[in-house]
């Protein structure tokens, strides 16, 4: 699937315009996008990064990494996904960067999601849904998620987010109402962010292939 990821990432470069500040996500597909962005780095003003991992890769390419507090809203955000449904709703957060990813998506006029074909699903939920949680609330949130959804929350032991929080991965879900589930989980005290991108889905999904498919 690495070639499909690369093809999707290369296609996303078509959306980058001269003078832009580009929002950049996290993950294996985004790594290909950063490499492609490095070839045109002289044409853009810089990037806003969703993770320390992406920040390091951007800087390796000589791309200036900027603070979202100073840039204001962005024209473009490019990121991957763990799952994508036909309505461009996403599950994200396998790399534990979901909160910063959601912040940048919210601040961006256009959100381009780049995936390989294996990430396309008819209904979200086969991939465990990540939920970022304040550490002291981990058990409370897990109990409430179980009661609310019937899904099985599993603590991602040993993982600490860039924000200093922990992640619960909720298994065995069928997300037939992504917007409703995102809203409900966000109401649980201690939840920082839910890895459902439904209220703010992708505007465009690029599926890697020969040629790439644009949805």
Swiss-Prot record:
CDD domains: RPI_A (cd01398)
EC number(s) recorded for this UniProt protein: 5.3.1.6
Active-site positions on this chain: 101 (proton acceptor)
Record field: catalytic activity: aldehydo-D-ribose 5-phosphate = D-ribulose 5-phosphate
Keyword vocabulary terms for this entry: Isomerase
Gene Ontology MF annotations: ribose-5-phosphate isomerase activity
Subunit-structure text: Homodimer.
The protein, known as: Ribose-5-phosphate isomerase A
Biological source species: Xanthomonas axonopodis pv. citri (strain 306)
Lineage of producing organism: Bacteria, Pseudomonadati, Pseudomonadota, Gammaproteobacteria, Lysobacterales
Gene (UniProt): rpiA
């Amino acid at each position: 699937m690495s070639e499909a990821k690369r093809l999707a990432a290369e296609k996303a470069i078509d959306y980058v315009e001269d003078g832009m500040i580009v929002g950049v996500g996290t993950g294996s597909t985004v790594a290909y996008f950063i490499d492609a962005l490095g070839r045109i780095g002289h044409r853009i003003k810089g990037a806003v990064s969703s993770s320390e991992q992406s920040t390091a890769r951007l800087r390796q390419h000589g791309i200036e990494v900027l603070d979202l507090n100073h840039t204001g809203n962005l024209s473009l955000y490019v990121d991957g996904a763990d799952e994508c449904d036909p309505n461009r709703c996403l599950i994200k957060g396998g790399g534990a960067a979901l909160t910063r990813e959601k912040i940048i998506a919210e601040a961006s006029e256009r959100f381009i999601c780049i995936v390989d074909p294996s990430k396309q699903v008819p209904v979200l939920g086969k991939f465990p849904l990540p939920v970022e949680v304040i550490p002291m609330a981990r058990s409370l949130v897990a109990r409430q998620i179980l009661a609310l959804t019937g899904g099985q929350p599993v603590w991602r032991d040993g993982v600490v987010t860039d924000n200093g929080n922990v992640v619960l991965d909720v298994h065995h879900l069928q997300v037939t109402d992504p917007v409703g589930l995102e809203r409900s989980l966000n109401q649980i005290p201690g939840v920082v962010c839910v890895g459902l991108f439904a209220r703010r889905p992708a505007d465009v999904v690029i599926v890697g292939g020969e040629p790439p498919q644009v949805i």
